[in-house]
């Protein structure tokens, strides 16, 4: 969150100019399967599970394994260090010894996961919520504070535990929260069964996402896979849990220790929750699948009128699971914002095709109110030397639609924001269109023709001035008597229509960017905008749209 405040969870400010690429360190090398070295942009940065905040016109990324980076333009990044990255044992050694450390996982260095940072106005401090991970889900989220967002950091204490049972319960704050007293026979005297079941409430205390709601209250979501995503209230005076708030035990809704359930559960994948507010809606982002290159990691979107939910997708499917959904990364719940795409606007090479995109944060910059999605991605055919995978942090602009959803821009943000069309003539023309299929993902397997499963390639459509959408080459009218086509001459097959929107739709005011697209019997609400292509920087008209719970992208060819 920005120090200068805003109505969103993490508001931001923008600044012109950029960190000089020469300050970002040398360009790194990655290798494709054919042995060709791929030189990465020196302004790029690899921060896993990136959380973004802003202070005084500078953007900061914080990620897993204490990686930090900063930028003045969200394009050119440089790494930086602080006392947490240099010597984590000095800050976290005691809590590591007290809870997560086990013989099966003895090193703290690989177990500092997914921090998030927020400005606490009451404390006058930056608060970092960091996961200290252990085997068997014996993890703890801790609080660190700093006067400046780049550090140095001071350890405050634990916020929430996971992986407890009767043998170690008294080493946590669970008895305090549940108001338990030790029994004379050594038993707990409380049914902990639900905390031992991965299909119930046995979660991993990782992936903290602090949030400041519109009423000024601080909350924190957390959790990973298994038992779902939960949220409880924080005390703004301490930054720790608000122990005065009690939560009832209600199946699939609330838990006395973990608070309010907002998503997932029943062993269904789902982690990396994040929230942002826009036009009276709270939007929940979370990642389905597994984070590896072939794991199908992907961002799904839900919304609610309340920070605490209930969250649903466009088709009304709840974010909370009420039963097992095997391979839910291949199912239709949640709007999939991005996928693996290869088209002529870029990326053109498989070494640059994004796969396994996820664990995002989001930010609103105070300069103009524009929102941005920040996430990490792996690549179809890019591997670090000595490692089987390579990853980067990427940024895309988030665009609100006229029916109250958010879509991601078709091209990565490289300094140029989305520019609205000035009229119909800007929109008409040929488009390459890709669909972010919820039911498939890049898994490393190849078809008989050598193309990868799960990499989406475009279909060519033409948007006509009269509102028709056609596809393909000219077809003889007499060869298609059963096509029910609105034409009486030879020509391309009409497969849809489009029209600009004006006035108000579902309570939202439309602008020149808003349009309705009817394509293959699905109605999409679209945002048209000029953006530079990734492959060459050429400005082209694009659109991002949502319909029937599915996102599509289009780019003029």
Regions found by a protein language model. Give the residues of each.
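Carbohydrate-active catalytic/glycan-binding domains of CAZyme proteins
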Residues: 1-557
């Amino acid at each position: 969150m920005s120090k200068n405040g805003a109505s969103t969870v993490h508001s931001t400010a923008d600044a012109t100019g950029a960190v000089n690429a020469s300050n970002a360190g040398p360009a790194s090398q990655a290798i494709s399967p054919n042995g060709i070295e791929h030189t990465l942009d020196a302004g790029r940065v690899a921060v896993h599970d990136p959380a973004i905040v802003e202070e005084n016109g500078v953007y900061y990324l914080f990620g897993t394994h204490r990686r930090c980076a900063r930028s003045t333009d969200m394009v050119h990044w440089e790494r930086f260090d602080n006392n947490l990255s240099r010597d984590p044992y000095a800050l976290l050694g005691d809590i590591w010894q007290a809870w997560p450390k086990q013989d099966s996982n003895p090193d703290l260095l690989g177990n500092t996961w997914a921090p998030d940072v927020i400005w606490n106005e009451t404390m006058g401090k930056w608060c970092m919520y960091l996961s200290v991970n252990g085997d068997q889900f014996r993890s703890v989220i801790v609080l660190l504070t700093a006067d400046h967002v780049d550090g140095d950091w001071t350890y405050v204490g634990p916020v929430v535990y996971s992986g407890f049972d009767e043998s170690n319960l008294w080493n946590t704050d669970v008895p305090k929260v549940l108001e338990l007293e030790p029994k004379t026979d050594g038993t707990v005297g409380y049914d902990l069964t639900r905390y031992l079941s991965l299909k119930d409430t046995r979660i991993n205390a990782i992936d903290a996402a602090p949030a400041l709601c519109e009423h000024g209250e601080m909350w924190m979501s957390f959790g990973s896979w298994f038992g779902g995503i939960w949220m409880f209230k924080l005390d703004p005076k301490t930054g720790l849990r608000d122990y005065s708030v009690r939560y009832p035990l209600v199946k699939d809704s609330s838990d006395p220790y973990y608070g309010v359930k907002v998503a997932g559960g029943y062993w269904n994948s789902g982690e990396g929750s994040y929230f942002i507010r826009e036009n009276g809606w709270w939007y929940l982002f979370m990642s389905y699948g597994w984070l590896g290159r072939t794991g199908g990691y992907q961002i799904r979107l839900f919304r609610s009128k309340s920070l605490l939910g209930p969250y649903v997708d466009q088709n009304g499917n709840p974010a909370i699971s009420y039963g097992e959904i095997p391979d839910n990364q291949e199912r239709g719940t949640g709007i999939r914002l991005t996928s693996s795409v290869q088209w002529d606007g870029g990326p053109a090479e498989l070494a640059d095709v994004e796969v396994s995109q996820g664990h995002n944060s989001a930010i609103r910059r105070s300069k103009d109110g524009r929102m941005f999605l920040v996430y990490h991605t792996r690549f179809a055919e890019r591997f670090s030397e000595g490692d089987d995978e390579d990853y980067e942090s990427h940024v895309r602009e988030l665009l609100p639609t006229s029916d109250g959803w958010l879509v991601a821009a078709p091209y990565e943000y490289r300094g140029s924001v989305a520019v609205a069309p000035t009229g119909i003539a800007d929109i008409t023309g040929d488009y390459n269109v890709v669909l972010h299929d919820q039911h498939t993902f890049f898994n490393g397997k190849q078809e008989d023709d050598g193309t990868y499963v799960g990499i989406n390639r475009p279909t060519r459509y033409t948007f006509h001035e009269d509102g028709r959408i056609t596809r393909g080459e000219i077809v003889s009218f007499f060869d298609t008597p059963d096509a029910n086509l609105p034409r009486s001459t030879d020509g391309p097959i009409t497969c849809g229509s489009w029209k600009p929107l004006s006035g108000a739709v579902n309570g939202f005011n439309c602008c020149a960017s808003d349009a309705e697209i009817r394509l293959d019997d699905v109605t999409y609400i679209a945002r048209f905008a000029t953006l530079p292509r990734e492959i060459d920087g050429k400005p082209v008209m694009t659109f991002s749209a949502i319909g029937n719970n599915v996102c599509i992208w289009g780019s003029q060819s």
